[in-house]
Amino acid sequence: MRKILPSKLAFGIFDHLDEDGNAMARQYADRLTLAEACDRLGFYAYHLAEHHFSPHGRSPSPNLFLSSVAQRTRQLRLGPLVMLLSLSHPLRAFEEICMLDHLSGGRAELGIGRGSLPIELGYFGIDPDAVAGRYFEASEILMEAMRGGNLSYRGDHFELNNVPLILRPHQRPHPPTWIATNRPESARWAATNGANVACVGPASLVRRITDAFRSEEGLSSDANCNASFLGLLRMIVVGHSAEHAYSLAAPAFQRWLNNFKFLYDLHAIPVPPNLPLTFDAAIESELCVVGTAAVVRRTLLDQLEEAGANYLLCQVAFGDLPLDASLYTAMTIQSELMDRVG
């Protein structure tokens, strides 16, 4: 595990693996090609979301896909962002993370969360009222399991009796942990517990999260030995000209938006109020950063500074963006940002 705070900006890849219109096998192959390229380019990690029964995510089992990424890369770290602990049995989650950590030679990053859309969990018979409790208990069990030995636990949702924990993670005491949040109180919890945070939203609002994290981190006596990444997520498209970039990004964002809204529309429920419903709104809300290399570099650096973030989560593949476009954006981020300021 990391032992010092990051002194410079770091850069990773975030992916929903949302449906791009191609056959699943083709899309998986394209993403593996992208992951290989990002490994060569020096990105820190590849983070993959978990979604179910929706075109918003073709990776309902992130660890399964990430095991393929692990075999095709050498330095790139990898992990779910987030693994839905409200859905998974914590012992199963523990065993999967141990396997991924060893398959990757100790490169796993562990993002955990409860899930943002109750409908997805409802398909599995999870009562929305039970989600928070299941997540709390599962996260307790998961982190306790990392210690090894025999595990017993009694809660409202899980009961374990002297379970022999044969597996151990490669990284000790456990892989670096992450949460995704837009709430200052969650950021304070992360700082106290040595977790990293990933945020999405306007830089001015994300600043509240990073300030809360740092204020709590300064009070913590035992969490500061591990590096803290304060991540800012952006959907990024770089083109040879502004017109070229916008011609790629606008239709890709629309497809991504349709994928995102699929279950909301199917069940006639309102989408999150902060979701931009047009490409122009996505630019205005800072979710998307699109343009030439110079414009994108300047915009991202300004937003990172305003947000107080030290880790840029680059979503360079979304909707029906062609693989070549994603590769070009990744290469430009490497040359224009990572080489200069990373």
From Swiss-Prot:
Top-level taxon of origin: Bacteria
GO cellular component, one term: cytosol
Record GO terms (molecular function): monooxygenase activity; oxidoreductase activity, acting on paired donors, with incorporation or reduction of molecular oxygen
Classification via Gene3D superfamilies: Luciferase-like domain (3.20.20.30)
InterPro entries attached to this UniProt entry: Bact_Lucif_Oxidored, Luciferase-like_dom, Luciferase-like_sf
SUPFAM superfamilies linked to this entry: Bacterial luciferase-like
Keyword entries, A-Z: Monooxygenase, Oxidoreductase, Plasmid
Family, per entry: Belongs to the bacterial luciferase oxidoreductase family.
The protein's name in its UniProt record: Uncharacterized protein y4wF
Organism annotation: Sinorhizobium fredii (strain NBRC 101917 / NGR234)
